UniProtKB/Swiss-Prot annotation:
Source organism of the structure: Conus textile
Name of the molecule in the record: Conotoxin TxIC
Domain notes: The cysteine framework is I (CC-C-C). Alpha4/2 pattern.
Leader sequence segment: 1-22
Domain of life per record: Eukaryota
Length: 62
């Protein structure tokens, strides 16, 4: 019973928190999604057999 008031207060605080829909941005106001897209395309390029044949982090050529 001692935890019930604390639980109610925490529930009210989390309900009034910021929305999850907010888009993450850097300090320069560039969306972080563009950085994620760049990282994904770089990884895709590195995993291409023709571009990374012989590197340890890539799939061996075959």
């Amino acid at each position: 019973m001692h935890c019930l008031p604390i639980f109610v207060i925490l529930l009210l605080l989390t309900a009034s928190g910021p929305s999850v829909d907010a888009q993450l941005k850097t300090k320069d106001d560039v969306p972080l999604s563009s950085f994620r897209d760049h990282a994904k395309s770089t990884l895709r390029r590195l995993q291409d057999k023709q571009t990374c044949c012989g590197y340890r982090m890539c799939v061996p050529c075959g």
